[in-house]
Amino acid sequence: MDTTLDPGLGLRIRRTESLTSLIRRELERMIEVGELKAGDRLNENALAAKLGVSRGPVREACRGLEQSGLVHVIVNRGVFVREISNREAAELYDIRAALYALAGRLLASKITKKQVTELRRMVREMEEAADKGELNVFYPLNVRFHEAIVQFSGNGRLLSMCTSVHREMHLFRRRTLDMPGRMKISNAEHASIVDALEAKHGDRAARLMEDHVLKSRELLFGPLGTPAD
């Protein structure tokens, strides 16, 4: 696995952000877009060489990723992107469905025209990516769309909980979007969600958000199926 980081990464270091934090964010991005996949080994020496830094901040970044559940350390072997079991994945889907339903209900009561415009812009961009079959473009937009809904809901604790679940779900969520035609179907569901939010229909928005997540679960495991590892 090529663990090359963004060549301009070192140039974007801010005084208020440590190198360790920057490396961690970049590694999270690589996992999010599938550049680093479940089971891949993170070569600390290679990453340090790419950045022109010592192994220290790279090692610290990996420790942070371990705490967030994205990687795990195998003694005398190294750091690996964590592989999620089917049962863990199903449990995360169930949690995410409940959290998103709440986000939809909360946001519907307070959504602004500016927020609706922003969500519709993302839907249009995802539609363009789906038309071109560009999963690597669609997926980050998809992530931002869902994050925006939770953020717009205005509930800080909900945002924190969703962020934690999202991080782990990056390890397998792309699998459903890889399925033929799934990007178009998923984005049609996005458009319906925005329609419900704009109309301030809280119950409908909550139901659509929950269904949207559970449909992805069903694609992986079958209707109400018990996943087998």
Give the role of each language-model region:
Residues 1-109, 114-115, 151, 217-229:
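Short linear motifs at protein or domain termini
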Residues 66-67, 71-72, 165-167, 181-184:
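Mobile beta-alpha loop/short-helix "lid" or hinge segments that flank ligand
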Residues 92, 98, 113-174, 188-196, ...:
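Conserved amphipathic alpha-helical segments that form helical-bundle/coiled-coil interaction surfaces
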Residues 169-173, 177-180, 217-224:
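Short amphipathic alpha-helical interaction/hinge segments
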